[in-house]
Amino acid sequence: MSDKKDIVSTEPELIRISVRSLVEFILRSGDIDNRTGSGVDTEAMLAGGRVHRKIQKGKAGDYRAEVPLAWEMDRGDFVLRVEGRADGIFTDAHPSKSEAYVNDTISEDTIYMDKDAEGDDDRPGLCDDRPRLCDDRPRLCVDEIKGIYMDVRELTEPQEVHLAQAKCYAAILFLTDFAAWDDSLPDDTEPEHNRERIGVRMTYVDLEHDDRINMFDSDYGREELLAWFDSIVERYSLWCRHHIEHKRKRDASMGPLTFPFEYRTGQKNLVSSVYRTILGKQELFLMAPTGVGKTLSVVYPSVRAVGQGYADMIFYLTAKNQTLTVGAEAFRILADRGLLMKTIVLTSKEKICPMNEPSCNPDDCPYARGHFDRVNDAVFDLLEKKDYFDRDVILTQAKEWNVCPFEMGLDVASWCDAVLCDYNYAFDPKAHLRRFFGEGKKGDYIFLVDEAHNLVDRAREMYSAGIVKEDVLAAKKVVKNVSRSAARALERLNKELLAIKKELLLVDGRNPYLVLTDSTVLGRIQNEALRAFGELQILFREHRDASFREELLDFYFEISDFVSTFEGMDDDYVVYADFNEEEHLSLNLFCVNPARNLQSMIDRGRSAVFFSATLLPVDYYKKLFTTREETYAVYARSPFASEQKVVIVGSDVSTRYRSRGASMYRKIARYIHDTAMARRGNYMAFFPSYKFMTDVLSIYRTEFDEADINWVAQSRYMNEMDREIFLENFYEDPEMTMVGFCVMGGVFAEGIDLVGSRLIGAIVVGCGLPQVGTRTELLRTYYEEKTGDGFNYAYLYPGMNKVLQSAGRVIRTDQDRGVIVLLDDRFLTADCLRMFPREWTEYVPCKVDQVRAVLDRFWEGV
């Protein structure tokens, strides 16, 4: 049965929002300040669950815990449902006496603040000018419990947002005629409580000392509370009406929208496959060679699915900025043909921050100061003016309204139909967009994962963690004069790491490593890391403005990541110790297979499409990206004729380590020279490493220099301007041949689009196999045990992917002509040949003294 929403229905749309989300959005105010948590930060939420249960369990009498409440309001063109769970509801038989409110024992650390019957209040502004209670029947009270990391005895009034949450629950009780309470009474019991007034209690609990409690009680009449609640709802309704009107325009714009170009060979099948995947809530692996138009082939059906009600949002995810530009262009093409879809390209904080460097607090940044006072107006204004939001648009609006552009961009994304961003915004537990992917949150999201081959290493990086012994010692030195308990905790952790270091020093080998499997040892490490992290949390809360915070910040995040990763580890992880580049002991939690972690994030959406020009072998990627058995794969045929290219394999070249030397480098240099001499144009030669590249380049310059051939080499540290200057050497119809010396897997090996005569040849040196190292060997061992295919998983598949990406820089359009030269005899082995794309079936093996003749024949036929 289809879950398609009825887009032609005249029924008003139902919009649901939690009480907490409503008040936090409408009533937020103040500064951005990364030096402090907001009283209810992530840590407090985790610990708060325990405190909630303890407080609720201790209540006696008629106290009801976790009471679900909801109210639907017809707002004309939509229905708004506000819902949530009240922490507690109870009756108060004697509203003027504080003891009557409490059904459990009050500890000596409990503080109670109440508005008395005469209307006096030690906390101005909570209950001003309310009439005295004239109905002596028991009154219902809503209890809102908040666990915070501070001495709650210092609080003089509740936070506005917290109190507003409780008031919303109280208002819903009025609106529902107290049904949640009355229906919970025994069948033969008549409700006996005041129906015109209601009490609200804010219960604050110190999470570090949960016997410290501070309670604030206030009283509201029906009329005043419902008027307040309606004002909150009306303010939110403005946003809802704007969004609904936009969706109507968006969906109407899709009526006449068709695929913007004539379908290329195989492209229509891609579009249909993506559409069926979304309808079926499935996952698709799509390999489409350059020229098929894969980006539009996934974006167009996704847009149609949103317009037809199958999905709410599109997340277009990439690993590199260049690919984001390609995705944005696809949405712009559809917009040029009438599509009205709000689309945002998210930029990292570092790249969009208008300050010299991000320092997100009101003392250092004017955009952080009062940000939350202005940001809602800034966002609403921008949504009314534009449909496409990139870095320049966001930054201009943020400066005009004096708000943080990064945070404003995230708020704008909440009201968009398509979000284009880095992988980590969706998949990284440390950086994902919590408004969409936070714990327990799900939606009808479509994940379009571009250049999906890059997700393998990125995912392993996201879900791995590590801690360095020297960092622990450095942190101990910083805190020893501030907190003895923190210093002791760090010293205990250091001792555990020292024991591992001593054991590692006994391991022979050039790059020794030690795999830890003893559960007792691992348990001690986890406990000491948790204890040290807990002490640092306390230290950070108690010294919010201390200068040492800056020194500790990196280590704080390091150990936080380590602790959270440790807690979620399973048998897809390997724990090992080695020495890092600085010869310091590093203890690593290495995620060898990220499939389960990725699946948990993908399951928060509707469906996912993983697409790339290089997803071979597809089963390799399936096992690394998903745990589902039923996934689908589509391999699109290239639209280009075989006559447009020639693939040559140099059978007399070996790039194995033992074969490297001057004679082999000379042979490779000659291959490059003869390839470039066969026809004037632009070429790129890709090498497995910088050292290999420079060794060959040295011989090329000395022995094969030609007056009519220029060359340029990639350097290790190139900024964006350096890259642009490098690519400017590859222009149309050059008068002289240009050879670019590049590195496989680098910035010029993928994501660049040099069409026509801007690039007519790619020489790929070696199979791209990763260097033998600790992690590659751990991967080989793991996958040998799991699949019996350890070498291929650790070395061949990642290496050949780099080869395919590098070679894919040639032949970008149906007008292009070019050559691909693969230099390594291993390309002719069965394992490598199985990974050749279909378009390479007519490859030509040859030796260095034959390559010129092969190329001459090819170019003569063009």
Residue ranges and their predicted role:
Residues S651-S663, S715-L828:
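Conserved RecA-like P-loop NTPase helicase motor core
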Residues L279-P301:
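Walker A/P-loop
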Residues I244-M287:
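Conserved pre-motif I regulatory segment
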Residues K247-D251, G255-T258, Y310-V419, N424-F427, ...:
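A substrate-engagement module of RecA-like helicase motors
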Residues M1-D92:
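Metal-dependent nuclease catalytic cores that hydrolyze phosphodiester bonds in DNA/RNA
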Residues I394-S414, V419, K430-F437, I538-S654, ...:
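A contiguous, basic/glycine-rich beta-loop/short-helix subdomain that forms a polymer-engagement track
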Residues V298, T325, W401-A418, D422-L530, ...:
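Signature of the SF2 helicase/ATPase Hel1-core->accessory helical subdomain module
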Residues D74-D116, G125, R130-L226:
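Mg2+/Mn2+-dependent nuclease catalytic core
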